[in-house]
Amino acid sequence: MCIRDRDYGIFTSAYGWFNVFAFMLIIGGIILDKMGVRFTGMGACLLMVLGCGLKYYAISTTFAEGSTLLGMKTQVGLAALGYAIFGVGVEIAGITVSKIIVKWFKGKEMALAMGMEMATARLGTMLALAVTVPIATFFGITDDEGVFHPNIPAPLLLCLTMLCIGTVAFFIYTFYDKKLDASLEEEGAEPEEPFRMKDIWLIVTNKGFWLIALLCVLFYSAVFPFLKYATDLMVQKYNVDPELAGTIPSLLPLGTLFLTPLFGNVYDRIGKGATLMIIGSVLLIFVHTMFALPVLNVWWFATIIMIILGIGFSLVPSAMWPSVPKIIPEKQLGTAYALIFWVQNWGLMGVPALIGFVLNEYCKGPVVDGMQTYDYTLPMWIFAGFGVAALFFALWLKGENKKKGYGLEEPNIKK
């Protein structure tokens, strides 16, 4: 199997086709608020299974030479379509899980629960990245000419199997969710008001919502797109061996496994959610400024800076996501989270393209040993600028919290 760079770019971009341009993520949020977590969660699981199954079929099947689908080679078009469907399921599953956590932990250890959920998700991502190549290699074959061919569909089949197990697990969860609803009724809890379409207007006219959404897109735009270029930065600026260059950026997601639940627990018990977001934004600015300045271009300094970024990357999400239910009523949470994710996806699509353009147009260095070098100073200042903007909105959010009494500085645990 051979896929050109252009085809691979089309395939990877497919994740956002339906979510961003067809507004499926927002529609999913509305369905979540109207139909509930059980219906929406099962639907999201089935979409993920369908999408992954389509990808597996596309990658494992040999199609007629010259056949096309959606204006692309059939294999690429079918795989991209599967990835787009999978992306809808993933994003809707994400907002569904967030609403489930609020349902179970509101007034309790909500930030800790969200932190543990984020840590578990990142652990899954790390494992997926770690086992893909070994599995493809293990199930590979050597042809008659002695050329080894890795089994590319094998990791996809494993993922499809894991998704099926996850779907069964969520189906089992639905029974526990029914029990929770029954126990709340027995305790005399007031039934939640039904979601109405006019609630969308109430969300988008809520200043606190937009402050959180803009803080989210600016902060994540300075982290995830940076990680796409971080390995090359380690090579170009800090002279790290290319085979080891990915080790330093990998410290960031590894650190969040432990720090995000830790800071979430702090928010639950002590409060200071807006302050945590401000501190995280300040650390983000500091880190990208250090990466931009021509000082201490050695590997150990880059490692220290990356660890500090990991702290900032844990501080903001641990406080930001649990703060949304303090600003938005629970009946509107699915739509609110969907809108935030939708805004975030625009940033995560646009910023990598911006950085790539800046590198190619303004940051090219000499060609060394046949390889193009780049000066990452300007991109790092751009990332620092996103951090400054995130800090501005974090400070604004803290001021708005004082006016509106959202309770962002108060503990989540109600005594």
Tell where the protein language model's regions lie, with residue ranges.
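Helix-to-loop junctions at the C-terminal end of transmembrane segments
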Residues: 22-37, 259-272, 359
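C-terminal ends and interior cores of transmembrane alpha-helices
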Residues: 46-71, 282-296
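Cytoplasmic helix-loop-helix junction between adjacent transmembrane helices
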Residues: 76, 82-120
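Glycine-rich segments within core transmembrane alpha-helices of 12-TM secondary carriers
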Residues: 111-137, 341-352
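Symmetry-related core transmembrane helices of the 12-TM Major Facilitator Superfamily/SLC fold
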Residues: 153-173, 378-396
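Juxtamembrane intracellular "pre-TM" segments in multi-pass secondary transporters
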Residues: 179-212, 413-415
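Extracytoplasmic gate region of multi-pass secondary transporters
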Residues: 206-260, 351-352
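C-terminal transmembrane helical hairpin of 12-TM major facilitator-type secondary transporters
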Residues: 273-320
